[in-house]
């Protein structure tokens, strides 16, 4: 089969779906990726035997002319490539790609990785996007979702029909061979957040909690790893990051295509403090696989990575004091208790987040199409 993967970011395809793309290639399928080339993807390599078609799109633009151009460009690519199946990811590919596939009679699946900005914010733009989403996804064969709460909301809001929904209970999965358990024992504790640098990811709460913790534990480090995307709604500016570094609250590590090199260091505890629904957060799943304790927001897409008190703590979103309390609670644990949390994180990853179960799901969807 010829299979297309269409996303709003080459980085997203390689980072989140790279293992699936390589797996389908190895099964003998012809795989083509369609996406813009974004800044974070520079330095990342397209897998051997896989083609990439670069396409212009304005990810965050609300100008309808930009979207019309994007739709007709997708239509042209799909007509020329004539794939047997297309997987779409993120809002604009899900809307315009699904419609283009429908017009050409091509089977497709849309992945709704999370209910982020469009579903969580009010305003006319979000309402229009929601209606477009609802209309377009009616033409998808399947709609992949990453947690039960998101599935429920999509069905209740009539964005998806129950028979369309495919629940990936372990999210998009983690390669447990790449992200191996590592000894986390250390005299030093580092609280690390791995995420796009957005206020929606809990940036402000992390900074304020860091200041509270450092009053009594000045030796503790709070670090941030992830791309800065100032074009995105609710992005944190580079100037704000600089100011927070100068205050001593945090250390910004920049961005890397190999997060395990930072996450795998001894003494790491992972933070993810999203204010709104996630799909199933990738960095937290990777942290579990590496054997890192977790502190995360008690929201869908984050809470699935934490067993309270066993491998970490859940905190209410936007609650700075609750976050600081959880960080201080972890610091008060004995070495044996911290080690137990690390072991429990790895066990959870092995039980729930193995990438092999996700590969099987893609295979089943394609098999249904062939039948």
What is the predicted role of each segment?
Residues 183-201, 206-211, 223:
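Conserved donor-binding/catalytic core segment of Leloir-type glycosyltransferases
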Residues 226, 236-256:
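Nucleotide-activated donor-binding/catalytic signature segment of Leloir-type glycosyltransferases, i.e.
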Residues 88-94, 112:
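Short His-centered aromatic/hydrophobic patch
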Residues 308-309, 313-320, 329-335:
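Conserved acidic donor-binding segment of nucleotide-sugar-dependent glycosyltransferases
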Residues 53-54, 134, 138-180:
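Donor nucleotide-sugar binding/catalytic pocket of nucleotide-sugar-dependent glycosyltransferases
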Residues 14-19, 198-212, 285, 321, ...:
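A conserved mid-protein helix/loop that constitutes part of the nucleotide-sugar donor-binding site
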Residues 270-271, 293-296:
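Short hydrophobic beta-strand element within catalytic cores of glycosyltransferases
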Residues 322, 329, 336-352, 358-364:
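A short, well-ordered alpha-helix in the C-terminal region of glycosyltransferases
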